Each structure stands twice: as structure tokens, then as C-alpha cells.
Amino acid sequence: MDTSPLCFSILLVLCIFIQSSALGQSLKPEPFGRRAQAVETNKTLHEMKTRFLLFGETNQGCQIRINHPDTLQECGFNSSLPLVMIIHGWSVDGVLENWIWQMVAALKSQPAQPVNVGLVDWITLAHDHYTIAVRNTRLVGKEVAALLRWLEESVQLSRSHVHLIGYSLGAHVSGFAGSSIGGTHKIGRITGLDAAGPLFEGSAPSNRLSPDDANFVDAIHTFTREHMGLSVGIKQPIGHYDFYPNGGSFQPGCHFLELYRHIAQHGFNAITQTIKCSHERSVHLFIDSLLHAGTQSMAYPCGDMNSFSQGLCLSCKKGRCNTLGYHVRQEPRSKSKRLFLVTRAQSPFKVYHYQFKIQFINQTETPIQTTFTMSLLGTKEKMQKIPITLGKGIASNKTYSFLITLDVDIGELIMIKFKWENSAVWANVWDTVQTIIPWSTGPRHSGLVLKTIRVKAGETQQRMTFCSENTDDLLLRPTQEKIFVKCEIKSKTSKRKIR
């Protein structure tokens, strides 16, 4: 088991504990009303510290000032277009992170859907002890709400045409902007990118981002692995649709092997850089959805990642599925929906999901421990030797269900090659044992029979059944590869459904 993420999470939690203890604060969710009152008394100290930047033809931000309509003209604000505002999170070094400029460029690269692209720069309030930065989120949210009200009054920009994209603490800033804007109409959309967990997990909806804060709220959870009661990203659902890539706890390609060397060289500031991989993956998944609009990542409703890994949750009936990122289908719901998907370790992050159901008949008296590989041939591409491990071994007459993901679109699946990947030595032992020991009343080589392979493609929702090309020999032997082709099987269940 890889213990590096565990060690890192413990270090992060200890850092927050140390900060909180130094400030005499508790990490338990505290009613935000008391915090807000303390912040409001010092509001004049922070009056001008939040900046609102607009990005025109260049990626150099132009500052918009509330009650200064001339700045709108100077910055090239187009009131006929929607407004998308990016809100960053907690800062350790006081510097705006590189992903901001990547997202700005990605948003501006949508010629079919032009928008005003803005940034809420609250770096001076975010660059502080975490607990203090948390307290500042409500204040900054109110300032964002004030900006939106002013734009509505001065240039008639409808708040329903506003999309706030908040990362980490910025997600909760977005929520406070939505809850404090007032009036009968809500902000159009809020996207929470791995919304911060500490001091928000388990709190009331009014004290964090929640579905009530906008007409539509979507959230992407990428670093929710919990230790000592805390997780970097919030784990609980906070939107109308909550996406959990790879289960949401940790992300592929995020290696912690260099963590200890970095700490030795740079001190505990190295933790901040290491955390970015999984926490910031939410940002890059969202950017990826903008850059690869033609290949959106599909997500599927499921109870948990364990069920999803068995391929049990690929049904998209009645519009149950949705796409992750900018182009999500916006459907407000009365109850949050949790969706799961698998991604690659790098952009483009999209994979293709398949459920495989394999029916084995083990005619021996004990479970067979072994590994297999599958090679898939599609109308577009082929994939060779995908490893398959079936838990505790193959018991008698059982169907196994599991999820396979592919990095490429192979088209329609037309053939499967299934191989028992034991050594030739094991094959000789297998034959010898069967010669010595008679297996019940069956034929000499009875043992492991592979009857059918049923497949469901998540992205296309196509169902297929594959049978052995040689129907006279269904026995699978060590080192042997069998070819399976499409076939039609009418089961009793399907007959009942037809009726």
C-alpha cells in the first residue's frame, strides 16, 4: 500500500492544527454568524483589498472599480455577453497561481460561446493563516455580490448570465456571493473546484457552498482522502451535481516519492507544492473540458467508487449521466446527485468506460487463483493484453463484473481475445494433476469453462454478448488464448422483458 498520501495528509492536518492552536481556535465547524460579525467590524481595514480584473484581448488584467463606470469601458466590458469570473483559493506564498492564466486563456478560446472573463483577486486576504483566510471568505463573497449588483444596475447585466468558478476556498467565496446578493433572482451558475474541506466539512449549507447559492451548482471533488477528521477537499455533496473523478479521494499520476527530499531542501513549504497535484487536478479537469470540447468526459451516478469499479453503474437511462466540466448539462435538482468517472493521469483526461461480465464454470472443488489478459479489437483501434485480476479466485459457476477503461476510442467492439496468463510450468502441472485426479464424472480436462462475455459501453450505452469462436471447446487452459466473437443469446430474463 502506498503510504505517501497518508503521510502527506497527516502533515497537512498537523500544519492546520498548529495554526489553529496558535490562534486559539477550534477546527470544529463554528457558526459563521459569529465569524462574520468579527470580520464586519474590521471591514474598513480590507475595503480596497479585493480587486476585480477583466481580461480583454490580452491576458493582462484590467481592473474594474465599483461605481466607476469608466473602468468598464476602459477594460472592454461587453454587457451583451455573459460574465465568467474565476475565484482563486488560499495562498501560502501570496502569488497568483499559473492555473489562473491557463483558465483565462481556455475561456477566451471559445469562439462559439464568447464571454467576459474576469478574476476576483483577493490574494492579500487569502495569503494568511488558513483559519483567517476562511474568515475572509464571507467578506470577499459580499464584495463579489456588490460588484454583480452594480453591474446589474449600471449596465443591466443579468445575474442569471453570471458564472462563478471557485477553487478551494474560492468555491465557498462563490457560495457566499450567491447567498448574499439578495433579490428574488439568483446567480446563473457556480462551479466549485475541489472546495476546501477544513472548517467547512459538515457545516450548515448557509456556511459553505450549497445548491441554494445559484440556479445551478456543480462541484468537482479530487482530494477528499480523510485523515484525523480532515480532508483537503470537501467530501460531502455541495451542488446539484457532484463529480468524483477516480472516487474523488486521490488522483492518478500524483506521486509523492519526492516529498521527503523536497521537505529537506525547502522545508514544509514543499508540502504546498505537493498538495497541488490532486487538489488542483479539479482545475485542470475543468480546463481540459474547455480545450477538448469534442471529447467530453462522461460521469455516471453511483453510490460509491467500489460499486463503480465493478462496472455496476454505467446506466444513463432517463438522462441520469452528465458531462464533467464547462459543458455540463445544467439541470437543477431537489437533491444532490453524486457521479463517478475514471480519468487519465494527464490531459486529455477522458477515458472510455466498459462493464465486462464474465461467466465462469469452475468444475474443480477449490477456487482457482490466476490472472488473465484481454485484448480488444474495435472498428477503429485495438488494445493489447489488458490485465484482469478476479479477487479471491474463481469459484464454481459464478459471473464476475468489473470495469475496464481505455485511453483511446476503439470504436465498436467486434472481437475479444481472452488469455489465461499462467506459465508453461503451471500448464504442465495442471495437466499432470488432472491425469492423476479424476474430476467427478466429467471429461478428463474439465476445469475452467468460460461461457460468455457480456459487455456494456458506457459512452455509447451499447450492450454486446461475445461467445467462444470454437463452440465445441469451451475449456480454458493455462497459457491458452481463446477468441470470442459477437453472438446472440436469448435468456429467460430477456424473453420475459420482451413480453
UniProtKB/Swiss-Prot annotation:
Instruction: List the molecular function annotations (GO) for this entry.
Output: apolipoprotein binding; heparin binding; lipoprotein lipase activity; low-density lipoprotein particle binding; lysophospholipase activity; phospholipase A1 activity; phospholipase activity; triacylglycerol lipase activity
Q: Which domain of life is it from?
A: Eukaryota
Q: What is its EC number?
A: 3.1.1.3, 3.1.1.5, 3.1.1.32
Q: May I ask which residue range the UniProt record assigns to the signal sequence? A: 1-22
Mutagenesis / variant outcome for changing S289F? In HL deficiency
| UniProt-listed GO biological process terms | cholesterol homeostasis; cholesterol metabolic process; chylomicron remnant clearance; fatty acid biosynthetic process; high-density lipoprotein particle remodeling; intermediate-density lipoprotein particle remodeling; low-density lipoprotein particle remodeling; phosphatidylcholine catabolic process
Indicate the quaternary assembly.
Homodimer.
Please name the PANTHER family in this protein's record.
HEPATIC TRIACYLGLYCEROL LIPASE, LIPASE
Q: Which family does it belong to?
A: Belongs to the AB hydrolase superfamily. Lipase family.
Q: What is this protein called?
A: Hepatic triacylglycerol lipase
